[in-house]
């Protein structure tokens, strides 16, 4: 790969990340009824299973679909199911999903999502605002 190809690949990756971020945020807004941004909305034990699955999937992509399909069929929590479906319906990478929902010391919650990833969410909001202004 020469320098030009590498730069083109980086540009494509950035563009894909912006598109993926927008799809993730749109999907979450559609699937989760947002109230007060700091109101905890925990996924409970399903969220813990989801994070474990995401870790496995990030390391062993080939096994991830079977594991996800099994988990999706057994989940009772629609929010956890919605996050899993991002991977297979919208093509979202596990790494991006984990980026928004992962923390070792805290439960998965909207409070955590807003606090820990406020900068990333602000970038998504800015991108969506730019898209709306340009439309």
Can you say where each PLM-predicted feature lies in the sequence?
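N-terminal interaction/assembly modules
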Residues: 1-74, 96, 102-107, 126-135
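Short alpha-helical segments used as structural interaction elements across diverse proteins
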Residues: 11, 62, 82-84, 112-114
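Generic detection of well-ordered alpha-helical segments
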Residues: 66, 77-81, 118, 122
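Short amphipathic alpha helix immediately N-terminal
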Residues: 75-96
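Residue-level detector of secondary-structure transition/capping positions
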Residues: 88-92, 105, 121
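Short, basic interhelical loop/turn and adjoining N-cap
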Residues: 101-119
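DNA major-groove recognition helices of helix-turn-helix
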Residues: 113-131
